[in-house]
Each structure stands twice: as C-alpha cells, then as structure tokens.
A protein has these predicted regions:
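Active-site loop of short-chain dehydrogenase/reductase
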Residues: 8, 63-64, 91-92, 137-151, ...
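Substrate-binding pocket helix/loop in short-chain dehydrogenase/reductase
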Residues: 106-107, 111-116
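Short-chain dehydrogenase/reductase
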Residues: 2-89, 102-103, 113, 260-261, ...
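C-terminal helical subdomain
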Residues: 192-193, 211-289
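Catalytic loop of short-chain dehydrogenase/reductase
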Residues: 138-139, 143-185, 194-199, 209
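A short, exposed helix-loop element centered on a Lys and neighboring polar residues
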Residues: 130-131, 177
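Conserved Rossmann-fold SDR core element
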Residues: 27, 91-93, 173-176, 183-195, ...
Length: 289
C-alpha cells in the first residue's frame, strides 16, 4: 500500500477543532483534500475554531480544504455535503465520524432534549454519514470509514454514571460492528479508534476539570497519527477493528509516547470506556486513577 495520503479525499465531521482538526492536519501534510463538515461557521467564545479557520490551517499545512457547514442530524445537509465533496475533489476515499455530543449526567439529571442531541449526533449521525458515503466510497481504491468510538466493553461501571452518553457513544461502535460486516465484500474498511487517556481538547477542559485535567492529557496528535496509519492499511483486510491509540501505534513501530504528553511531569488521566484487559505499551508511563 501507499505510504502517503497525497491526493486522497477525506470527509471529517466535527473537524473545526480538536481531534477532528488534528486528523485533518495530519492528512493535509501529505497533500490530501479535506472536507471540514461541522456546525461552527461563526466564532464561539467558549470553543475555538470555525470551519473557515480550520480550512486556512489545512491549506497552510499543504492540503486542499473545503469548509462545509453541516449538522450531522440533518439528512439533506449530509447528502449535499457528501455530493459537494465528491464533485469538488473527484471522489471520496475516507470518512471520519468524529462529531460527538456529550453530557456526563445521571439519568435524573439528563433532560430528554440533551438525550436526543447525543443520540442524534453520535449514533444516528454516524450511521447516516456512513450510509450516504458508501456510494462514493465504493469507487475508491482503498476506502475507509473511521469512528472515534470505544471498544464494545459493556460494563455497568461505564453506564451507571452517565447512561445516556454511554448509550450514544457505544451506539457509534455498534455501527462499526454492523457496517464492517456489511461492507467487507465492497472492500470498504470500517474501524473504531479510541484514546487510552484523556485528550487535551476544549471539551475536556470545559467538562472534566480545566487545566489540571489538560495537563494530565495527551495532545490530539496521538489520534491523528493513529488515524493516518489506519488509512494506509489495506481496506480489504484491515476492517472491524476496535483500536486503542497507543496500543495500535506501538504495534506499528511507535515507541516514543512522551512526545504526545501535555505535561510529562504529570501522571496521565485514563479515558472512559477503555477495557480492563487493554494493556498499555511497555514504554508508557504511569496512568493516574
């Protein structure tokens, strides 16, 4: 397989900031085309980045960018965005379902509007983007769909503190399980990628404790590097995998994980939904908790 994404076209949801933008920038450094499918067209004082600022960064990194204002809950917007992407760049090779809504609340503290948002974005949005991307991906020589979602480790401890969010996030992983089997004969790979530790994004800062958790996190670059490696795999054989970022990178020759740490002096904070039997690479320093 090729060792570059040069000339490939990616459609990434939630790519105006954070993990989605990091994946986009890693592809852009290869010379890829990137459609930025996100809601943020106007600046938000609480969340940095818009589809237009992301497009500027992608272009500076060496890629070609297409900013698209898209709500992944809206069928017409999703269909139109995929059609525009394929028409602009002459096809579609990779879809990244990164957009996600989160509310770390108990059942009694979760209002139904928030419940519907999480399921509409996470499970339904992921299914819909993937579904409508298939006719374009079928024409690619090495098509990939990637979900930023956890391994299917259905334990009470993951659900009890925030049932609605866990349901919605695992819903994305169920899409992986189903579509990997359905699309295997079409040679469209469908995989999931999940971080072992918290990742330094605005969402983590706002939801999990501000600067202290940020210092105990890794940068989004670890997921960007892992995603890049996934996209270079043969789609006909590398599918149906639920991957933890550092384990996958270690298995593919990466040994230095300190470069991803925000603060190397602080113990790393573990993320949600990492299975108990998922062992970190031997070179990984201590996690807290």
């Amino acid at each position: 397989m090729a060792d570059t994404l040069a000339g490939k076209t990616l459609f990434i949801t939630g790519a105006s900031r954070g993990i989605g933008l990091s994946i986009a920038l890693r592809a852009a450094r290869d010379g890829a085309n990137v459609a930025i499918a996100a809601k943020t067209a106007e600046p938000n004082p609480k969340l940095p980045g818009t589809i237009f600022s992301a497009a500027e960064e992608i272009e500076r990194a060496g890629g070609k960018a297409l900013p698209l204002a898209v709500d992944v809950r809206d069928e017409a917007q999703v269909r139109a965005a995929l059609e525009t992407t394929a028409a602009t760049f002459g096809g579609l090779d990779i879809v990244v379902n990164n957009a996600s809504a989160i509310s770390l609340t108990t059942s009694q503290a979760t209002d139904m509007k928030r419940f519907d948002l999480m399921h509409g974005v996470n499970a339904r949005g992921t299914f819909m983007v993937s579904k409508f991307a298939v006719p374009y991906l079928e024409k690619s020589a090495n098509a990939h769909i990637l979900m930023l979602s956890p391994p299917l480790d259905l334990q009470e401890k993951w659900f009890a503190p925030n049932t609605a969010y866990a349901m919605a996030k695992y819903g994305m992983s169920l899409v992986v399980l189903g579509l990997a089997g359905e699309l295997r004969r079409k040679r469209i790979a469908v995989n999931a990628l999940w971080p072992r530790t918290t990742i330094a994004t605005a969402a983590i800062r706002n939801l999990l404790g501000g600067d202290a958790v940020m210092r105990a996190s890794r940068t989004p670059d670890i997921l960007a590097d892992a995603a890049h490696m996934i996209f270079l795999k043969d789609a006909g054989s590398f599918t149906g995998n639920f991957l933890i970022d550092d384990t996958f990178l270690s298995e593919n020759g990466v040994a230095d994980f300190d470069r991803y740490r925000v603060d190397p002096t602080v113990d790393l904070a573990p993320d949600f939904f990492v299975p108990d039997d998922s062992k970190p690479p031997a070179s990984l320093k201590k996690l807290s908790g």
